[in-house]
Amino acid sequence: MTQFTQNTAMPSSLWQYWRGLSGWNFYFLVKFGLLWAGYLNFHPLLNLVFAAFLLMPIPRYSLHRLRHWIALPIGFALFWHDTWLPGPESIMSQGSQVAGFSTDYLIDLVTRFINWQMIGAIFVLLVAWLFLSQWIRITVFVVAILLWLNVLTLAGPSFSLWPAGQPTTTVTTTGGNAATTVAATGGAPVVGDMPAQTAPPTTANLNAWLNNFYNAEAKRKSTFPSSLPADAQPFELLVINICSLSWSDIEAAGLMSHPLWSHFDIEFKNFNSATSYSGPAAIRLLRASCGQTSHTNLYQPANNDCYLFDNLSKLGFTQHLMMGHNGQFGGFLKEVRENGGMQTELMDQTNLPVILLGFDGSPVYDDTAVLNRWLDVTEKDKNSRSATFYNTLPLHDGNHYPGVSKTADYKARAQKFFDELDAFFTELEKSGRKVMVVVVPEHGGALKGDRMQVSGLRDIPSPSITDVPVGVKFFGMKAPHQGAPIVIDQPSSFLAISDLVVRVLDGKIFTEDNVDWKKLTSGLPQTAPVSENSNAVVIQYQDKPYVRLNGGDWVPYPQ
């Protein structure tokens, strides 16, 4: 009898060592809540494996406790991996730039990540978990939800977790010439200028479409003449590359009705900057004469006929380079020279008034003063043909007034810049000089954050950041454009600007009695919205944005 009692008391299996998830239940519940709200790029299988690691029975209690300590850094890394925050590669690659931020700006950035509503919701969830766990085995529900999420993943692509990610009906896009259809590399159909988007949005199909896009873009370029006609009229080209300005920013600042926008002759309403960082944006603009390339290829040598300003130099245009800053942060000036092909000397910045200080404490010069200096310098040029690249950043996040650490109000800075540019346009009109001005923002400033990124964060080139306002204005025309701007609302990018420049190279637009504006603006190259940084790619596919991080699976961009 004694022997029988002893045998039944001895453990026959490991069942008694299934201790549940304990406090890790709350960890997973928080994730489920964030996933439901659309704030996570959740990885079901990795989380299920992590839960299995936590649940695996371990007889020795000391080893069980040790497992929890080991799980802490793993859980933190997995949580970070499940968010949309920049990965280690991105942080390491930009570590030197972050080190250049002022302390006040770093504090400002950190405070933007604090969402008091979310903190309140998590607190309520904590209290609910503590209360319900007295009677309910929460671990059972957590494991069931994890299994369910993994079953959903097995049923289709990873983004099937969101209803918005379901395949839509076939959408056909049209290019600048709707009647033109060609085949891209690999036999993929291309309608007009853009690869057709007919396949369901699976990761494999989106990767294939992106490859077809780059293959098709590699074949496109603007055709510049070998020389100008004898009766060509000289004029000046001024390209203003403004940092941190998108349609979303203008709307958030309440400046959509600013008179500046009504003073352009041509306005691109659907222009993709293709990136959300300054260096790559400038390179893409300076290489506008060829189709869009991948982010990696931006830092590889390009064909000589890709460089817009070099093409103009070959036709007798004098190059000018000027900046509203010193160009040192992030090696911007170096990138412009090495990868953008702008080797001309930087226009003199001596005694320019400093109106702002950048997030790194560097000077930001007054745009009116810089533009007036350009007027003076180019007026003294012996060559009446010139092409100027002007990069300026008065709207950059973190800019502040001298003596004040707080970031200056975006709306006030944007209002000032728009007013100054409008006044400059008036002065140009009065001068009688023949000038083509092209205003092309680098990217938006992310004035409004979204579910993936807080305000000011641009690691992922979202549509609200890369959809930028581009305007073209001609001065000194015999027959200037009348009425509202001509709106180009087809998907466009830098190649359209290059082609537009080619169409007016002979300068006759300035002397003609009647300008055929429809002919000038019709059939410009269209470019599918593809935006890329070193660690993220965002595409528009079947009228929905999709994002891929660090070469992983495609998921719908949270709306």
Segments predicted by a language model, with ranges:
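Phosphate/adenylate-binding glycine loop and adjacent helical scaffold
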Residues: 505, 509-559
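A short beta-strand-to-alpha-helix junction
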Residues: 299-306, 407-417, 460-466, 478-501, ...
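Histidine-centered active-site microenvironments of extracellular/periplasmic hydrolases
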Residues: 11-14, 434, 440-480
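Active-site-proximal alpha/beta segments of enzymes that process anionic O-linked groups
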Residues: 156-401, 467, 494, 499-519
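A structural motif corresponding to the C-terminal end of an alpha-helix
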Residues: 315-316, 424-434
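Proline/Glycine/Serine-rich low-complexity intrinsically disordered segments
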Residues: 236, 261-264, 390, 422, ...
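Active-site His/acidic residue clusters
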Residues: 330, 374-419, 423, 446-457
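Transmembrane and membrane-interface helices of multi-pass
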Residues: 1-181
